Amino acid sequence: MLDVRKLLAQRPLLFDGGMGTYYKAKPGQECEQANLTDPEGILAVHRAYLAAGADAIKTNTFSLPRLAAAQQLGWEQLADAGWQLAAKAAGETGAAVFADLGPAPDTENLPAEQVYLAVAKRFALLGARNFLFETLSAEDGVLEAIRALKQTVPEAFVLVSFAVLPDGYTREGRYCAELVRRMAQSGVVDAVGLNCVSAPGAMRALVQQLGDAGLPLSVMPNAGYPVVARAQVRYQGKPEYFARELSRLAAEGVRILGGCCGTTPQHIAALRTALDALPEALPAAPAAKPAAAAKPAVETDDAFLRKLRTGQRVIAVELDSPKDADLTAYLEGARRLQAAGADLLTIADCPIARARMDSSLVACRVHRELGMNVLPHMTCRDRNLNATKALLLGLYAEGVREVLAITGDPIPTAERDEVKNVYQFNSRKLAQYIVSLAGEGREMPAPITVFGALNLNARNFEVELRRAAEKLENGMSGFLTQPVLSAQAVVNLKKTRETLGEKAKILAGIMPVVSQRNAIFMENEVNGIHVDAEIIERFAGLDRAQGEELGLEVSVKATQAAAPYADGFYLMTPFNRIALMERLIARLKKEGIAD
């Protein structure tokens, strides 16, 4: 069998092309199932690619990590059959075989690391020494699995390949240059590259951005972009164009080439011919594209962040956007809160999954008309990557420099036939994506500051704290907490400060209770809120005015208890009662609790 390392030292390595889009699986059947149900068909595909001139082929096992993560019975047999078929075909020509592993889902019950390692070890037992982890959108668990694999098989050659959109980001919002850098610096990855999603021309532009990765670089684009014809997805990229673009990459230093979706033996044969026509002496790595003159960073004069960073206690006030299309009363309420001394207006993103005026559009209007700092909430529930990026660019253009990244309340089960959850991100990955958009050559000259949510009332607060630490690692700057309406919430706030330190900016949540009915409702029907029984009892029999007075006193005491551990306060407006919030802000400033 071909020695991959020796070949790469001499010339570029040519992989096969797409399996799933070339082999037509039966409706409702995974392509990998054909390893057992149609072995001759899979063997014929391998042989066709080898006849086209491929130096290496992939096992027909792309979906195995997903099947293994689902603990689907029989994935081991699919691995065995996939390896045996590829090895049989490669044995006829002396080509290399790569055990092919697609993305593994990362769950709390079964981390991606364990899934990757289980599948890779299965292949290692069968004799695999070359491994391809491909079409990844993030590095979750893959490096840990490779380190463990190389303890068992130290001679293993491992190629890690990411699926990157033409703008340089994966579907999980990771920037390709950062992912490639992490692989190159890991010490356990032997080659790194890009595959799928993008067509040859776009992938060539991405490679020019990467430059010398420090490892052999791999490129396996799709044949083109998919079109739907007669209810079938087709790729119309021509073999001649595919070969021309990829042979240019080889001439520029890319050492591993092949194809992904839509590519066929005809594409690989054309590329083989083009590669064989290149001179023997080729660059060992691509040269970086000359950098354009760096644009000076444009920093917004952000009074809220400046005040927060200089140790003054800030006041953020949440005011839910309207349920209709009229912003008149909302803008008047925002003006009053600004005049009262609010440093920031926060706007929820369709709380409890009920549609309201878009939080980001409202934020832009408030910022434009009032010059007030705004913090629109941005959930992962309703937008995919494209919509999220488009919205962030619009916010930046409007001068909005802070967002609150949250996963978002799920849509009620009864409505899911008509309204769909998206959840392409979780809040940690969304934060990482937002931060990655800023930097030299990126979309934003200066970063948007990302805050997150922290539930002080979580039943398992240790888990909540671990997640908070992960959010900080992923680029968040601080947290807005759920309301402090219990003694335990204060204890947890203190623990948060001790655990996360001064780096995390914490705005303690304060939500005035205005009646016993209101308190009972929050305790029983609002996720993440706990109201001490003593507080509930104190509101018994009070009218509206009395309820507001008591709510004001309870809120002031909550801020006093939270103040030693908070950088400011996040005040939530109950039932649009602006006058109550004006009084609360005045009390906090008068008593020196907030600046």
Predicted ranges, named:
Residues M1-D595:
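Domain-level signal for soluble alpha/beta catalytic cores
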